[in-house]
C-alpha cells in the first residue's frame, strides 16, 4: 500500500500526455449520428500499453482534487441511455490493494475476449455534453480526467457512470434528477395520485305530476361533466315504465282525491272493499248484517257473549267445541246445496242490491248541504241564522242543492217540471215553499234548466225556434208544390202516350213538360238547400244552450238525416219502374226522392221544434216564478238576475262569523 501511494504522487509527463490524448478521444461526441467501432486488436494494444505504464509510473492524484471529486454532486441533464457503452471511472472501481498487479495481469487476458466498443448516439437527437474549456485559475473545478484502463478490475461492469455537468449552470434550468436520486426513489413506495373528489349528485324529490319525470334538470355545461357524474344523474331519474313508480302515482292521486272529497262515513262497513281486493265471496251472514243494522248489533253481542262463555271453564269449552264439530259438516252441506241450486246467488243478489241502495242514499245525503236561515228580532236589528246539522259542524257554507232531471226518452220529449223531494216523495214546489216559509226556513233548489235560464241561451233558442218555423213553412210549401208539379207531369206524359194533343193555356204539350221539368229541378234544389241551412243553425246554436240530455236528443235527430235520405232513395227506386221512353225519367226520379226526403225532414224538424219549445217555455216559467218570489211587497219592480249568479249577502251570525260565498 505504501508503494502504491508513493507512485500515485509521482508525475510522468509521457503518461499524462498519453492519457490526455485518450481523454480527448473519449470525450469526442459522435458526429452525424454514426456508430464508431474500435478494432479489437487496437483496444487490446492500448489496454496492455496502459497497464505497463501504470506499473512503471503510477499517476499521482492531488488530495484536494480527490476530495472535490468525491464530494461533487452528480447532476444529469439528459436521460440515461441504455445503449451507451460502459465507461469505467475510478470513482466506481474497487479500491486497489497490494495484489492489484496480479489482478491486472488476469484482466489483460480477459479483455481480449470482450466485444468491440460501440458508441450509440442518443435516440432523441440530443448531443452529449462537451467539457468546456477552463482557465488555469479554475483548474480545481474542472472535471477530473478518467483514469487509465489499467486501474480497473478485470471483470467488466454494466453500471453507467454519472454525467458531469457545469457547476456554474443556473439551478433554474430544466434538468432531470440524478441517477442516485432515481435509485433511491425506486426503493420508496409508489404514491398513487389522489383522486379528485366528485361532488355528490343532487337529489330531487319526485313530483306528484307524472309528466315532470321526463323534464329533469339538464346539464347545460357539458364540459365539466364526467361519465360517472352523468351516470349518477341518470340514476336519480324516474321512469314511468317502473311499476313501483306507477303504484306511487296512483297512491298519491288517491290521497289527493280523498283529501278533497268529503270525509267518509265511519260507521259504514268495509267488508265490500275487502271482498273486492281478496276476490272472495262475502259470507251470507256478513251480507245480512250489512243490510240490516239491527241484526248486525244483535249478532255482534251474541258472538261476544258466546266467546266469553266458551272461555269461562274448560268443561264448557269442550262441550261447545263438540257441538261445533257436529254442526259444521251440516252447515257445509247446506251451503253446497244452496250454491248448486242457485239459492245462494239469489240471496246474495237481493242483499247486495239492498246494500248498494242504502249506501248510495247515505252518500247522497252526506254530499248535500242546505242553506237555512231564521230571522230573529233583536235589539240591534241584526238577523241571526241557524245552521242546519251537518257532518262537520265547523264548516259554515251556503251551497244550493242541485237536483237533475230524469234521463230523456229516445222516442219522446221529456216533461220539464220542477219538483221538490221531501222524504223521498215528490211535492209541489209552491206547497213546499209555503211550508218552509211557515217554519222560518228557506231551501233553494235548482235543476238542469240553469243553462236555459241564461239570457244568451234563451236568445239562441228563440232564434232557432224562429228559424225552424220559417224553414218548416217553406218546406211545407215546397213539398206541396213539388207534389203538384209531379202530378201535372204524370198527366202530361199519359196524355202524350194516348196521342191526345191538347193545348194547355195556349201552349203546346212539349213546352208544358219542359216547363214542369225545370220547375221540379228548382223545387228539388230549394228543398235540399233549406234542409242544409236549418240543420246548420240548429247544430250551431243549440249545442250549449240546451241541457245535456236535450242536446243529445237533438243531435241524434240531426245525425239521422243522411240515413233518412238513403232510405227515401231506396224506397223510390224500388217502387218506381224505369221508363226508357221518357227522356226526363231521371229528373222525375230525383224529384220523387226529394219529395220523400222533404216529408221525413219536416217530421224530424217538428220534433226538434217541440224539444226546444218545451225547454224554453219551462225555463221562462221557472224564471217567472223566481221573479214573483223575489218581487218586493210594495209592488215596485227591481232588476232580477239569475239566482245562480247572485252573490250571497254578508250577514253576521251569532258567533260573529260570515258565511262563505
Swiss-Prot record:
Segments carrying the region annotation (Disordered) are 1-69, 107-243, 255-279, 354-398
Renumbered to this chain, the Pro residues biased-composition regions fall at: 192-203
| Basic residues bias spans | 1-11
Q: Where is the composition biased (Low complexity)?
A: 23-43, 107-140
Annotated Polar residues bias: 173-187
Q: Name one GO molecular function term.
A: transcription corepressor activity
Outline what the protein does: Transcription factor that plays a pivotal role in azole adaptive responses by regulating the drug accumulation in the cells. Affects the transcriptional responses to ketoconazole of many genes, including the target gene (erg11), an azole transporter gene (cdr4), a hexose transporter gene (hxt13), a stress response gene (kts-1), two transcription factor genes (named kts-2 and fsd-1/ndt80). Also regulates phospholipid synthesis that is not involved in azole resistance.
A GO cellular component entry from the record:
endoplasmic reticulum
A Gene Ontology biological process noted in the UniProt record is:
regulation of transcription by RNA polymerase II
Bias category Basic and acidic residues: which stretches? 357-366
Q: What is this protein called?
A: Transcription factor ccg-8
Source organism (scientific name): Neurospora crassa (strain ATCC 24698 / 74-OR23-1A / CBS 708.71 / DSM 1257 / FGSC 987)
* Phenotype upon loss of function: Leads to hypersensitivity to azoles. Accumulates toxic sterol 14-alpha-methyl-3,6-diol and ketoconazole in the cells.
Explain the induction of this protein. Expression levels may be influenced by circadian rhythms.
